[in-house]
Amino acid sequence: MDTLIKEFDVALRAIAGATRTARANPADRLAPDTEQMSADERRHVAGLMRINHVGEVCAQALYQAQKLTARDGAVRAQMDAAAREEEDHLAWCAERLRELGSRPSLLNPLWYAGAFAIGWMAGRAGDRVSLGFVAETERQVEHHLGGHLDRLPEADGRSRAILEQMRDDEIRHGNAARDAGGIPLPAPVRALMRGASRVMTTAAYRI
């Protein structure tokens, strides 16, 4: 029962944006920069950061489901450690959205539920498949973050600092999953993941 209560609390905090951070925000070392951007640039950056916030909501759901279904204690601990770092990402993105005068996606409950279901299925397929799913997810997220870094206005150093740290963390999580025995996913599964990501990013940019 205690475990269920704890995991329910994790879900509520992820959806509501009431997450805790263990690490300082990488943007804290930089001066405020929103006034150096035009209104259109701020709206564009807010759309990108909303996408990244949704991605971190989904990461919380995926890791939570995969942790609950993991057979091996070491895999469970690895999922838990990665989820805590992803919680930092979630809080950093939420803070940047507030600075930009924007808000998270209104569809966060839907994103969370869908990601949890996918993570549960991956976890039920076995630890090596689950770790392979983590590795592929992080590879796609790394690519996606690189694209966002290329699309940021030159004046937006604070978002850049956040996304660069997130990308470094995602690379490390993916490498750890492969090193722990994650197996490559079939090409159709990878393509399906990319398709689902495109749907999410298109909707989250605006809603």
Curated annotation (Swiss-Prot):
Reactions mediated catalytically: a 5-methoxy-2-methyl-3-(all-trans-polyprenyl)benzene-1,4-diol + AH2 + O2 = a 3-demethylubiquinol + A + H2O
Biological process annotations from GO: ubiquinone biosynthetic process
CDD domains named among the record's database cross-references: DMQH
Co-factor requirement: Fe cation
Compartments, record wording: Cell membrane
Record: residues binding Fe cation 1: E56, E86, H89, E170
Assigned GO CC terms: plasma membrane
Associated pathway: Cofactor biosynthesis; ubiquinone biosynthesis
Cofactor binding notes: Binds 2 iron ions per subunit.
Record-linked InterPro entries: COQ7_proteobact (IPR047809), Ferritin-like (IPR012347), Ferritin-like_SF (IPR009078), Ubq_synth_Coq7 (IPR011566)
Single GO MF descriptor: 3-demethoxyubiquinol 3-hydroxylase activity
Source superkingdom: Bacteria
Membrane-protein topology: Peripheral membrane protein
Gene3D superfamilies in the record: 1.20.1260.10
Coarse class of the protein's main subcellular location: membrane
Family statement: Belongs to the COQ7 family.
Role of this protein: Catalyzes the hydroxylation of 2-nonaprenyl-3-methyl-6-methoxy-1,4-benzoquinol during ubiquinone biosynthesis.
Protein name: 3-demethoxyubiquinol 3-hydroxylase
Organism listed in the record: Cupriavidus necator (strain ATCC 17699 / DSM 428 / KCTC 22496 / NCIMB 10442 / H16 / Stanier 337) (Ralstonia eutropha)
Gene name in the database record: coq7
